[in-house]
């Protein structure tokens, strides 16, 4: 089963990370909350799986298409 990269949909700041490596997540579970122009944007799991890695920290600026989380 191939890993799934979960990327940012826009340029924003990482406001809150809701998961940790090793966590089991379900489809549509919130992984990360981004903040842009005072709006909170949830980034959700596209499928159920296990969080393999998180490549950002709270407070980081991210760009559209940047990989935030890898699910196994």
State what each model feature region is:
Residues 16-20, 24, 53-56:
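Short histidine-centered loop motifs in beta-beta connectors
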Residues 26-42, 63-72:
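Short hydrophobic beta/alpha edge segments that flank linear recognition/processing sites
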């Amino acid at each position: 089963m191939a890993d799934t990269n979960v990327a940012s949909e826009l340029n924003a700041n990482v406001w809150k990370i809701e998961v940790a490596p090793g966590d089991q997540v379900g489809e549509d579970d919130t992984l990360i909350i981004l903040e842009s122009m005072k709006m909170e944007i949830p980034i959700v799991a596209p499928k159920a799986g296990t969080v393999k890695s998180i490549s950002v920290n709270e407070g980081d600026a991210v760009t559209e298409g940047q990989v935030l989380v890898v699910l196994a």
